[in-house]
Design a protein with these regions (language model features):
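Conserved phosphate-binding catalytic cores of ATP/NTP-utilizing and phosphoryl-transfer enzymes
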Residues: 1-6, 112, 116-140, 314-316
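A short helix-loop
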Residues: 2-7, 11-15, 22, 31-33, ...
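Short glycine-rich, Thr/Ser-proximal phosphate-binding strand/loop in the N-terminal lobe
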Residues: 15-54, 160-167, 299
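Short, well-ordered amphipathic alpha-helical segments that serve as non-catalytic structural scaffolds
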Residues: 36, 55-70, 253-258
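Short beta-strand-loop/turn "lid" adjacent to the catalytic site in phosphate-handling enzymes
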Residues: 65-103, 108
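Active-site nucleophile and cofactor-binding loops and adjacent substrate-binding regions
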Residues: 93-98, 114-121, 142-144, 171-174, ...
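Glycine-rich phosphate-binding/hydrolytic loop that grips phosphoryl groups
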Residues: 123-126, 300-328
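A contiguous, well-structured pocket-lining segment that forms one wall/lid of small-molecule binding clefts
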Residues: 199-270, 276-299, 317-326
Length: 328
């Protein structure tokens, strides 16, 4: 028996809009990765935390049934869960307590290791999965999801598996995810609307002559002005062109912010994570623009950009292996 392949770590992430469970072997092969999107009412721009908690409880029951199929062939040696949104003091959201306590219950019942991480660290680790990035010890990461748009300076701590994460840019008001979702809902799409906006933008053959005005200074972006501009023309233009305008503004905002921050910190590698990073339009256009400045973009597969639990499981594997090495 190959213990590295048969011993697995379970990862759990219960975010604002997705319930996720993953299982990864000690050699970091993905054995299991499933997720369930939370249900959001039609014409709504989000979900209350209390409703999210309720749905996570039901979803974890369903996902754990699927996880049972692993029990005969694999040995669960640890569980790693995202306990809070970000690795800072006072970071808290009720939805994460569901996954945390569910993971605790699994760990206690199986008498295996229990590890904690955060939703943001989960995203970063998942985005590094199968990445060709040259310097994993110091790089920029752009975390852009439903409620977050942050540009992060990620530095490996000395003699540690953990990263030091410093916010060095981002949005000062709403996030890109909020801009995209609000626009999509106004166009009649279900929330979250990113996949519809992305499809529209890719299919739109009309050339943008005058894009939306952007507001970027020292790596920080203001997006409420973009939303106001969209609201003024949303009834006058077709949905595909509106979608293209929105994602074009995402690309141009990020280009301005990232070229500034990259040069300021002397870093030429950027890792992208979060649901907005799954956009094909953003990936293709932003990568091309940054490459002209000798800045290299790393996007993972869409299923690892959007909410998932693979990053949690990877972090769990690293912590488990480090403990095993120290105990030898």
């Amino acid at each position: 028996m190959n213990l590295k392949k048969n011993n697995i770590i379970i990862g759990i992430d219960t975010s604002c809009y997705t319930t996720s469970i993953a299982a990864i072997s000690l050699d970091k092969s993905i054995i299991f990765s499933e997720k369930i999107m939370l249900n959001v009412k039609k014409n709504s721009n989000g979900l209350r935390q209390s409703e999210g908690v309720f749905q996570h409880i039901n979803n974890l029951g369903e996902l754990s049934e699927n996880l049972k199929s692993l029990y005969d062939d694999y040995n669960i040696v640890g569980v790693c869960v995202s306990k809070k949104p970000r690795p800072i003091e006072n970071s808290y959201m009720p939805v994460f307590t569901v996954g945390y306590n569910f993971g605790k219950a699994i760990s206690n019942s199986l008498n295996c290791k229990f590890y904690e991480t955060t939703h943001q660290e989960n995203h970063i680790e998942a985005s590094l999965l199968n990445s060709n990035i040259l310097n994993r010890d110091r790089f920029l990461s752009v975390h852009m999801s439903g409620g977050t748009t942050e540009i992060l300076l990620v530095t490996k701590k000395n003699n540690s598996l953990e990263y030091s994460i410093e916010i060095v840019g981002g949005t000062k008001d709403i996030s890109f995810g909020q801009l995209i979702d609000r626009t999509g809902v106004k166009l009649g799409y279900d929330f979250p609307a990113g996949k519809y906006i992305d499809k529209n933008a890719i299919e739109c053959e009309r050339k943008i002559l005058n894009g939306l005005k952007t507001s970027v200074k020292d790596g920080y972006m203001n997006l409420s002005g973009l939303e106001n501009q969209i609201n003024k023309i949303i009834e006058l233009e077709d949905s595909k062109y509106i979608s293209k305008l929105v994602l074009d503004s995402v690309v141009r905002n990020l280009y301005k912010a990232l070229t500034y921050i990259s040069k300021l910190n002397n870093i030429d590698e950027i890792v992208f994570c979060g649901g907005v990073a799954a956009s094909e339009y953003v990936r293709n256009n932003l990568s091309l623009k940054l490459k002209k400045e000798n800045i290299y973009s790393y996007f993972t597969k869409p299923e690892y950009s959007t909410d998932n639990a693979c990053g949690c499981a990877i972090i769990g594997v690293d912590k488990y292996e480090a403990e095993s090495f120290r105990n030898k």
